[in-house]
Amino acid sequence: MLKFLSLGSSSSGNCYYLATDNVQILVDAGVPVRSLKHDLKERGLALNDIDAVFITHDHADHIKAVGHLAHDYHLPVYTTEEVHRGINRNYCVTTKLTPEYTRIIQKSQTVEVGDMRVTSFSVPHDSSDCVGYRIETDEEVFVLITDIGHATETIQNEVSAANFIVIESNHDVDMLMMGPYPAYLKGRIRSGRGHISNADSAKLIAEHASPALKRVWLCHLSEENNHPELARKTYETVLREYGLIAGVDFQLDVLRRKQASELMVLKT
């Protein structure tokens, strides 16, 4: 049995909590420690009980608090070598990671944390490096895919393996292209190493999800170029084109950008 909690999912800050009865981890650390403490405490949880932190990539909204978390709570932080170097270069990380708390992982490597198996996989994004994570117990497969420019074969395979998926649904293309962003930023977002749109994200799920998929959460929605109702509506429209119905074939939810979710218990 897995437990899942989103502690922030936007360009302002990203952090996700996953736990079994025996171990608790965070994926990404872009939310201030004070907010993490408050939101965990409200749900009967505590930072002191976290066992490890896994980082997807070195953009500030995913790493701002990682140094404070590691040093204040004596937490091992798992990253690829390139992401680790990027963290220590990033001026937004005021407390750098020291060797004591650094755990370097390779892509496709599986790390066992208690009864949880965490496997990284490569995803395309314009950071120093970027990975998604597959978190497994003996019963569940949970996949987190955020900040991706396009769907690679690796990502497609991870979607097919999952019972539960957190996946980026960053922007509506029309809102982005008609919006106030400068041309270079629009180009960056739409590139193969930028961010995935609502429609492309939905198509990825529709084409590659297995019948074992139970639940999907949309994450990392742009505040300027998207909104939750539009992301959901786009997903529902694309799914129907493939003969799938949200709420029937699997549950579909949208994670809040700057507010923590409820603590969810996941069962297959």
Label each region the model flagged.
Residues 1-43, 131-147, 164:
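Conserved beta-strand hairpin/beta-sheet module of binuclear metal-dependent hydrolase folds
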Residues 5-15, 58-62, 66, 77, ...:
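Structured catalytic core of nucleotide-sugar glycosyltransferases
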Residues 12, 60-63, 85-86, 128, ...:
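Active-site environment of divalent metal-dependent phosphoester hydrolases
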Residues 27-30, 51-58, 78-81, 143-146, ...:
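Active-site neighborhood of phospho(di)ester-bond hydrolases with catalytic His/Asp-centered motifs
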Residues 34-80:
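Active-site metal-binding motif and surrounding structural segment of the metallo-beta-lactamase
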Residues 64-73, 88-91, 226-233:
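Metal-dependent catalytic neighborhoods of phosphoester/phosphodiester hydrolases
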Residues 81-132, 136-139:
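Metallo-beta-lactamase
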Residues 153-252:
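Cap/insert and terminal regions of metallo-dependent hydrolase folds
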